[in-house]
């Protein structure tokens, strides 16, 4: 440890003078504080001397500082770097055996090879991330352009739909509704009429067969004639939904008699037809039609023979 210098002695004397002069008003500096101040000054001086010695030693070892910096930066030769690059392209993972073999072939230490591979993997990952980011960015831009185009198409179609709705009138909708209601009513009426016709025609099916048969005594061939008031049209009967008690005679209906005994052309029945009707239809309700009670209501007469007149 060196002796205190002149500067330290002067500061010590100034401190003592300050302590004695301000003894009444300010506290005096203690001995411990003085010792600490002296030790700090000594340490600063020693550090300065050590720095100077180190600077001189470095200058002696390396006369030119630029040469020292160049040696630190250039640790691997160009051939060594190329060989390491080829090894990295083959496999970026480094196991202990491979590390020792590469270090022996290139004349390097295994630690240097491991550090170089580690740094190279870090750079490779960075470049890979940059490539992936560029690809994703391009894809994002393409998708965004497609989205913008689709949005424009959507807006155009929406505007066109609005224009068409404005041009579309509202009256045809009401007309279509009324047409549907009328069609429904017509369909209901047609179904009801079909049901009535079916129910009415089922009861008279047997009688229609009997009257339409030519071999039957009740067929149109056996009729001589009815008055016009007793004729019923087939079409009108089908429309009303019921069948007539007397069949339509169609072409088998005979015209008015031209008998001389009959005064004027009249319609009537023959005796044979009346006799057949009274015999065959004795137990039928239709026989009441030819009874004596209703004879006065019939607007026709019949001729018993050609020589007799009207009764």
Curated annotation (Swiss-Prot):
Gene Ontology annotations for the cellular component aspect, listed alphabetically: nucleus
Region listing for Leucine-zipper, in residue ranges: 127-171
Keywords: DNA-binding, Homeobox, Nucleus, Transcription, Transcription regulation
InterPro entries listed in its UniProt record: HD, HDZip_class_I_plant, Homeobox_CS, Homeodomain-like_sf, HTH_motif, Leu_zip_homeo
Pfam families given in the database record: HALZ, Homeodomain
DNA-binding region: 69-128
Role this protein plays: Probable transcription factor.
Protein name (database record): Homeobox-leucine zipper protein HOX13
UniProt organism field: Oryza sativa subsp. japonica (Rice)
């Amino acid at each position: 440890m060196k002796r205190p210098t002149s500067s330290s002695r002067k500061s010590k004397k100034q401190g003592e003078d300050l302590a004695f002069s301000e003894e009444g008003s300010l506290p005096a500096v203690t001995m411990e504080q003085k010792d600490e101040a002296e030790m700090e000054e000594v340490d600063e001086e020693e550090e300065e001397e050590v720095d100077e010695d180190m600077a001189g030693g470095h200058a002696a070892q390396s006369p030119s500082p630029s040469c020292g910096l160049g040696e630190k930066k250039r640790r691997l030769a160009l051939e060594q770097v190329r060989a390491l690059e080829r090894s990295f392209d083959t496999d970026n993972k480094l196991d202990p055996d491979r590390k020792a073999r590469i270090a022996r072939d290139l004349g390097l230490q295994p630690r240097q090879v491991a550090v170089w591979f580690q740094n190279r993997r870090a750079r490779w990952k960075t470049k890979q991330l940059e490539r992936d980011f560029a690809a994703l960015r391009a894809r994002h831009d393409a998708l965004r352009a497609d989205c913008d185009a689709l949005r424009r198409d959507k807006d155009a179609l929406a505007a066109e739909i609005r224009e068409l709705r404005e041009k579309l009138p509202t009256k045809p909708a009401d007309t279509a509704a009324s047409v549907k209601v009328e069609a429904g009513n017509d369909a209901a009426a047609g179904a009801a009429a079909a049901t009535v016709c079916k129910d009415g025609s089922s009861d008279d099916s047997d009688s229609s067969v009997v009257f339409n048969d030519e071999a039957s005594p009740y067929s149109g061939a056996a009729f001589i004639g009815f008055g016009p008031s007793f004729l019923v049209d087939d079409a009108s009967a089908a429309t009303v939904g019921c069948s007539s008690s007397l069949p339509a005679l169609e072409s088998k209906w005979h015209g008015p008699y031209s008998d001389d005994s009959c005064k004027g052309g009249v319609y009537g029945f023959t005796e044979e037809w009346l006799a057949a009707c009274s015999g065959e239809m004795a137990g039928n309700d239709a026989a009441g039609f030819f009874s004596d009670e209703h004879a006065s209501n019939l607007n026709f007469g019949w001729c018993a023979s050609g020589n007799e007149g009207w009764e």
